[in-house]
Amino acid sequence: MRFGRAALLGLSFFLWLSATAWSEPVAVRFPEGVTRAFPAVRSLDGKTLAFGDFVQVAREDRVHSRLLFRFKDGSVHDENVVFSQRGVFRMESYRLIQKGPSFPETLEVALDRQSGVYSVRHRADEDSPEEIVEGKFEVPDDAYNGMLTLILKNLPASTGDTVSMVAFTPKPRVVKLRLTPMADEQVTLNESPMQAARYIVKPELGFFASMLLFDLPSLRCWILPGEAPAFLKAEGPLYFMGPVWRIEPF
């Protein structure tokens, strides 16, 4: 059994034991618009693993966001989110493609809120057949796949929240994420000292899950607060039980 399949089974068990109560969607404090950025994926020792392209555009009443990472080993992480921001942020559709040697398996998922239709295509390795799982799923109002840094920018200063993410095991399941503010950290930008807000994003486990499972990697994010909040960097895995990588501007 390859790690990819073991990871899916482990994630499925973890989600079954997790709390799944829905929360309210996050209020819009800073509306999103046209954005272009070029982040990079690096190991914690500073080695560059992938170059990225982040493109965000507004079309009518929807915002379309795409984050594409091309790894040096040929792997691809391609994440597309469409969301609305009429008073609150709401994920309307989500697509993710992960493939190549940097990932334990090939994965392609698609989820649409309005229709409730989802599709998952995954292959454990080159010698395994592709499996396709399709069906319908009710997307929580507070589900924010591919939107966590945006949500953190919109939290009031020094406050946290609990939101949802849809994980694919391969069937979609809801997992709660706790967004917790930590102590501010001083950072240097353009040779000027500034205070950055640091957050920990961690799955919220039920009692039995917390007793039975090993520690799951958390995501750490640094946000520059103010009248125009900015994402600085994040450290965490790009897939379940994956290595901790750093995402930051190139």
Q: Which residues make up each language-model segment?
A:
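Acidic, serine/threonine-rich low-complexity disordered tracts
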Residues: 22-115, 159-250
